[in-house]
Amino acid sequence: MHTLSISTVALAALLSGCGAMAPATGGKAPIGMKVTSTAFADNGTIPAEHAGVGDCGGKNVSMPVAWTRLPAKAKSVAVLLSDPDGAMGLGVSHWVAYNIPAERGQLKANETGGFTVGTNVAGATAYRGMCPPVGDHPHHYVLTVVASDLAPGALPAGLTRDALLAALKGHALGGQSVVGLYSR
């Protein structure tokens, strides 16, 4: 059985009303946001280079992520990487990036400029590569893009995942995720 962390439930609650934003399409399924990564397919295995360094087996390279079909009023996006399986099911925040201009459309692997990096689980303002326990089941890494009506630069530096979600409440226009798996 897969359990959800508190922060994952909070993100779902934040985005729960966003589906109604899509225009009617005459009986066809509505077209919403699309999030992809060239590093892995949805529910695919994440390459080791995106894991943490040292015993974690990687190079601590942040994942590339792209977004399309944003809501019309989107001004900025936030990118979040979390592991709901980590910390004994309480979840781990690996990457908090925000104040990203919506029209940018992507972040490349290991890109660091032109946006604000928030605080990860270790208290650092940086991408933190994956490092699940050796021999543990594959962890699910949820890479989420949230579109908002906030102008790029509107949010202060150093926000944690929870603080960012609180700041986006009432400003989120939609969100979408891609999930990757990683184990050691």
Regions found by a protein language model. Name each.
Residues M1-L4:
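Positively charged n-region of N-terminal signal peptides that target proteins for export
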Residues C18-R184:
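N-terminus-centered regions that define maturation/targeting leaders and the start
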Residues S7-G17:
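Bacterial N-terminal signal peptides
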Residues I6-V9, D136-P138:
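Short hydrophobic/aromatic-rich motifs at helix boundaries and adjacent loops
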